[in-house]
Amino acid sequence: MIKLKVKKGDEVIVITGKYKGKKGKILKVFPEQNKIVVSGINLVKKHTKPTKVSEGGIITKELPIDISNVAHVDPKTGNPTKVAFKFLEDGSKVRIAKKSGEIIGKEGK
């Protein structure tokens, strides 16, 4: 299994497929399947029957997409970028945008 460079809450942009060019935040990560759920991307409508607990109707929800179809958004420019890892002076490991060098998020020690 490969090391994932994405985390829940990261801002990503879709680079291929039907939703190409759209941005969203990661809601859920499935590392064993290399898939993620992004807000507002890959929406489907599901018809549900009424039960004692909930009403029936049409529910719109996001389905997972492959990690290879998205790229991180550069915090400085807003464009797609690749991610690299870097160690800071205090020993913490952070993810940085390769294009601008901006820190994307902290990994912890």
Curated annotation (Swiss-Prot):
PROSITE patterns given in the database record: RIBOSOMAL_L24
InterPro entries: KOW, Rib_uL2_dom2, Ribosomal_uL24, Ribosomal_uL24_CS, Ribosomal_uL24_KOW, Translation_prot_SH3-like_sf
Domain of life: Bacteria
Pfam families assigned to the protein according to its UniProt record, in alphabetical order: KOW, ribosomal_L24
GO molecular function: rRNA binding; structural constituent of ribosome
GO biological process: translation
Keywords, in A-Z order: Ribonucleoprotein, Ribosomal protein, RNA-binding, rRNA-binding
GO cellular component: ribonucleoprotein complex; ribosome
Ribosomal protein recorded as keyword: yes
Matches recorded under PANTHER family: MITOCHONDRIAL RIBOSOMAL PROTEIN L24
Family: Belongs to the universal ribosomal protein uL24 family.
Function: One of two assembly initiator proteins, it binds directly to the 5'-end of the 23S rRNA, where it nucleates assembly of the 50S subunit.
HAMAP family: Ribosomal_uL24_B
Subunit structure: Part of the 50S ribosomal subunit.
Name listed for the protein in its UniProt record: Large ribosomal subunit protein uL24
GN (gene name): rplX
